[in-house]
Amino acid sequence: MGRSKLQIIGPNGEIYQPTLKIQRNNDPNKDAEVLYEAMKGWGTNEDRIIGILGYRSSHQRIIIRDQFKALYGKDLITELSSETSGHFKKLLKMLLTDTDKMNARALYKAMKGGGTDESTIIEVLCTSSNCEIEDIKTAYQSVLKDYGISDPRRTLESDVEDDLSGPFKNLVIALLQAKREEIPFEIAEQIQSKGIKSVVDMNLVEQDVETLWDAGEARLGTDEAAIIKILVSRSVWHIQAIAQHFEKKYGKSLIDSLASETSGDFESALLLTLNTCLNRPKAYADLLLKAMKGLGTDDCTLMRIIVSRCELDLGSICQEFERSQGSSLEEWIRSETSGDYRKLLLALIGAEWS
């Protein structure tokens, strides 16, 4: 699983904060033994399971899973699945699966069979960085094998081609190329002191601002291709500058402009792509709110975001969530979930649960 340091730095140079309280000097043998004892005999000690898996990095968890098999000849996911149930079981399985494979499996399920879960495709791919997309594409091949699909022509991109249509498909295919411009982390760190103009070509920014206006507001109909080209290829810093200059020049935010010129899944995907570039933690905070607001909770999305972001930027996401809602993510989780499932989610966001 490759991870770029650029994922933890914002367009203005701020460093995003995680929530996972990782125990750095863990002994994977001891952790495996504790998990085995927690499931041994009659009943299961869920708190001991949470005490281990709620405080280990994704890398540590995979090592623990391997060590469990080496010590006991059993698969840890299989054992936990037989001892737990419901959302708690699903969350444990997510924690013991490589993050990229977890996302790849979600995409496969979103497109298999009759009907398509467009919201999952949008949530996973429109928020992902170049390296995350490349890792998901690789993991998707492993997921296909897990489901008994050996056709070498089947890829994530080919499934998207078959399942989606129109400008929404074009946007997703463009994102899958993972060609967004990036700058070295060391230069990105200096943006807070030197300003965004130090890392972007302002002449190109002005050209892009005019192109986006001409592709939407200034014409009858919308030139989706021109919009897609800019939003999926320019760096997050460049897009930040575009948004600032667009509003200054035309008196309307880029988000509002694109929302007025697009619709449906294409609009949702385009706006999430843009919002992720402008403020990644805010984009995820909005997704978490959407997952919990209203009747019922979208637990799969809630779990997937918390598992995938707790080591990267979930602390910053929590700050944005509370800023926009006036109440904390912890409060919402306590209200919307229950039992051991709630305890494990709270552990992952760095809150007290015992």
UniProtKB/Swiss-Prot annotation:
<feature type="binding site">
    <location>
        <position position="294"/>
    </location>
    <ligand>
        <name>Ca(2+) 5</name>
    </ligand>
</feature>
<comment type="function">
    <text>Involved in reproduction of the worm. Involved in host-parasite interaction. Delivered into the host cell by means of parasite exosomes. Binds to acidic phospholipid membranes in a calcium-dependent manner in vitro. Causes aggregation of liposomes in the presence of calcium, but not in its absence. Likely to promote membrane fusion. May provide structural integrity within the tegument.</text>
</comment>
<dbReference type="InterPro" id="IPR018252">
    <property type="entry name" value="Annexin_repeat_CS"/>
</dbReference>
<keyword id="KW-0479">Metal-binding</keyword>
<keyword id="KW-0041">Annexin</keyword>
<dbReference type="Pfam" id="PF00191">
    <property type="entry name" value="Annexin"/>
</dbReference>
<feature type="binding site">
    <location>
        <position position="336"/>
    </location>
    <ligand>
        <name>Ca(2+) 6</name>
    </ligand>
</feature>
<dbReference type="GO" id="GO:0005509">
    <property type="term" value="F:calcium ion binding"/>
</dbReference>
<dbReference type="GO" id="GO:0016020">
    <property type="term" value="C:membrane"/>
</dbReference>
<dbReference type="InterPro" id="IPR037104">
    <property type="entry name" value="Annexin_sf"/>
</dbReference>
<dbReference type="GO" id="GO:0043657">
    <property type="term" value="C:host cell"/>
</dbReference>
<comment type="subunit">
    <text>Homodimer.</text>
</comment>
<feature type="binding site">
    <location>
        <position position="44"/>
    </location>
    <ligand>
        <name>Ca(2+) 2</name>
    </ligand>
</feature>
<feature type="binding site">
    <location>
        <position position="113"/>
    </location>
    <ligand>
        <name>Ca(2+) 3</name>
    </ligand>
</feature>
<feature type="binding site">
    <location>
        <position position="336"/>
    </location>
    <ligand>
        <name>Ca(2+) 5</name>
    </ligand>
</feature>
<keyword id="KW-0111">Calcium/phospholipid-binding</keyword>
<feature type="binding site">
    <location>
        <position position="83"/>
    </location>
    <ligand>
        <name>Ca(2+) 1</name>
    </ligand>
</feature>
<comment type="similarity">
    <text>Belongs to the annexin family.</text>
</comment>
<feature type="repeat" description="Annexin 1">
    <location>
        <begin position="26"/>
        <end position="97"/>
    </location>
</feature>
<feature type="repeat" description="Annexin 4">
    <location>
        <begin position="279"/>
        <end position="350"/>
    </location>
</feature>
<feature type="binding site">
    <location>
        <position position="265"/>
    </location>
    <ligand>
        <name>Ca(2+) 4</name>
    </ligand>
</feature>
<dbReference type="GO" id="GO:0005634">
    <property type="term" value="C:nucleus"/>
</dbReference>
<feature type="binding site">
    <location>
        <position position="163"/>
    </location>
    <ligand>
        <name>Ca(2+) 3</name>
    </ligand>
</feature>
<feature type="binding site">
    <location>
        <position position="46"/>
    </location>
    <ligand>
        <name>Ca(2+) 2</name>
    </ligand>
</feature>
<keyword id="KW-0677">Repeat</keyword>
<feature type="binding site">
    <location>
        <position position="115"/>
    </location>
    <ligand>
        <name>Ca(2+) 3</name>
    </ligand>
</feature>
<dbReference type="InterPro" id="IPR001464">
    <property type="entry name" value="Annexin"/>
</dbReference>
<feature type="binding site">
    <location>
        <position position="111"/>
    </location>
    <ligand>
        <name>Ca(2+) 3</name>
    </ligand>
</feature>
<feature type="binding site">
    <location>
        <position position="39"/>
    </location>
    <ligand>
        <name>Ca(2+) 1</name>
    </ligand>
</feature>
<dbReference type="GO" id="GO:0005737">
    <property type="term" value="C:cytoplasm"/>
</dbReference>
<feature type="binding site">
    <location>
        <position position="292"/>
    </location>
    <ligand>
        <name>Ca(2+) 5</name>
    </ligand>
</feature>
<dbReference type="GO" id="GO:0042802">
    <property type="term" value="F:identical protein binding"/>
</dbReference>
<feature type="binding site">
    <location>
        <position position="296"/>
    </location>
    <ligand>
        <name>Ca(2+) 6</name>
    </ligand>
</feature>
<dbReference type="GO" id="GO:0042803">
    <property type="term" value="F:protein homodimerization activity"/>
</dbReference>
<dbReference type="GO" id="GO:0001786">
    <property type="term" value="F:phosphatidylserine binding"/>
</dbReference>
<feature type="repeat" description="Annexin 3">
    <location>
        <begin position="203"/>
        <end position="275"/>
    </location>
</feature>
<dbReference type="GO" id="GO:0012506">
    <property type="term" value="C:vesicle membrane"/>
</dbReference>
<dbReference type="GO" id="GO:0005544">
    <property type="term" value="F:calcium-dependent phospholipid binding"/>
</dbReference>
<feature type="binding site">
    <location>
        <position position="118"/>
    </location>
    <ligand>
        <name>Ca(2+) 4</name>
    </ligand>
</feature>
<dbReference type="GO" id="GO:0070062">
    <property type="term" value="C:extracellular exosome"/>
</dbReference>
<keyword id="KW-0964">Secreted</keyword>
<feature type="binding site">
    <location>
        <position position="43"/>
    </location>
    <ligand>
        <name>Ca(2+) 1</name>
    </ligand>
</feature>
